[in-house]
Amino acid sequence: MDTALYLLPVTLGDTDVEQVLPAYNKEIILGIKHFIVEDVRSARRFLKKVERSIDIDELTFYPLNKHTPHEVVASYLEPLINGHSIGVISEAGCPAVADPGADVVAIAQRKNLKVVPLVGPSSIILSVMGSGFNGQSFAFHGYLPIEPSERIKRIKELESRIYTEHQTQLFIETPYRNHKMMEDIIKTCRPTTKLCIAANITCEGEYIKTKTVKEWKGKLPDINKIPCIFLIYK
């Protein structure tokens, strides 16, 4: 395998690795000794799911989150500069997409280091695929404001975009606040605006359903404490 910064997708939940990741990913992972990870504990657990016999103690982990100083992130690439491949692992899904891993990729690109993204599950892409919404123009906004009036204002702004820019809008909420988010969307958006609720993607109990706001009213699913993406479109 080429010496590179490998972007290693992980499962979105307790799904079997074989169900969502190509066998090629395992080959690459077994050839890497250095990992830049969002969470060391979950990264170790994922690697054991990939190969039970893997010796975790032989591996080196470099923690990366939104608070990691730029100079520390840059120092993590020293093994790669010295000829050793590095893997980047997020807590769930694809690293560097709505994820701190983007910072280390940006530094690697500036240093002209080889970057190789591998195939794996992205809740953003999968939810767009399953929604029936515009897949040529879409935007993911992460978390919306917690403060009620600011949240309502933001939802209205995003709804405006689906009509003026013909762009699918995606956002998330802390799982235990999912129901409140659904209620805010229902009371804020036009009755004809379409809402897709995509929960537990690739996992047991997966739920992906698109209806108009009017059709959702009074018939919201029980997705409390379940990872979910909300999508709106015209």
Model regions and ranges:
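Glycine-rich, flexible N-terminal cofactor/catalytic loop recognition
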Residues: 1-64
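A contiguous loop/helix-start segment that scaffolds small-molecule binding in enzyme catalytic cores
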Residues: 2-6, 84-85, 164-234
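Class I SAM-dependent methyltransferase SAM-binding "motif I" and its flanking Rossmann-like core
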Residues: 6, 103-161
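Alpha-helix capping/helix-boundary segments
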Residues: 41-43, 93, 123, 177
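Conserved helicase motor
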Residues: 62-69, 144-148
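Glycine/small-residue-rich loop that forms an oxyanion/phosphate-binding "nest" at active or ligand-binding sites
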Residues: 65, 73-115
